[in-house]
Amino acid sequence: MYALTHGRIYTGHEILDDHAIVIANGLIERVCPLAELPPEIEQRSLNGAVISPGFIDVQLNGCGGVQFNDTADAVTVKTLEIMQKANEKSGCTSYLPTLITSSDELMKQGIRVMREYLAKHPNQALGLHLEGPWLNMVKKGTHNPDYVRKPDAELVDYMCANADVITKVTLAPEMTGTDVISKLAAAGIVVSAGHSNATLKEAKAGFRAGIT
């Protein structure tokens, strides 16, 4: 057991000075005023550093010199490990690896890799973010137009069956219809609107169906 001292602590609710973080068995046991520390506990000074909960990046295509969605060879556990190490240098402890519009085969590979990574490294990546392929072509941005398409039942069912490793799907609601949105949301996937040219009516229908 030891205490981290002489840092400014941001809890998410308040800013604490003259406090310590007590660590026991690798976990935070408590946060307390310095004056309440047991006299015998080891103190490790942080020399005025800022202490806060780790940041979470909910859309990360690549970092650390790698891209998760470049080629099939890049969609690997090793790529995700490199991204995790790069994230930690700037205080980002968790993230959603993001695979942009691609073929069914590459999406399924990404899902398999995500499952393998989560089994090997729990509590780092928080699941896969599939950005596309059900986007509006006029708002595709840098997404490959060859793979921008409307949903098919087989892929939707596959995604729902693997919802335990797919955290988020970004889609254009006017391209999918409400049934697909409802099905994904019911499976526990966060559905986000993006790369969309929806009318107000189409957008409202999408939000009612489960877009958050």
Where are these regions (language model features)?
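N-terminal metal-binding scaffold of metallo-dependent hydrolase/deaminase domains
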Residues: 1-37
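Divalent metal-coordination and catalytic microenvironments
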Residues: 7, 21, 26, 48, ...
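Short amphipathic alpha-helices and their capping/turn segments at secondary-structure boundaries
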Residues: 39-42, 46-49, 110-122, 204-208
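Divalent metal-dependent hydrolysis catalytic cores, especially in the metallo-beta-lactamase
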Residues: 61-63, 81-110, 123-136, 163-174, ...
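Active-site gating loops and adjacent loop-to-helix segments of metal-dependent hydrolytic enzymes
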Residues: 61-66, 73-76, 85-96, 137-163, ...
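Generic structural signal for well-ordered alpha-helices
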Residues: 80-84, 108-115, 156, 181, ...
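Histidine/acidic residue-rich metal-binding segments in metalloenzymes
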Residues: 119, 149-212
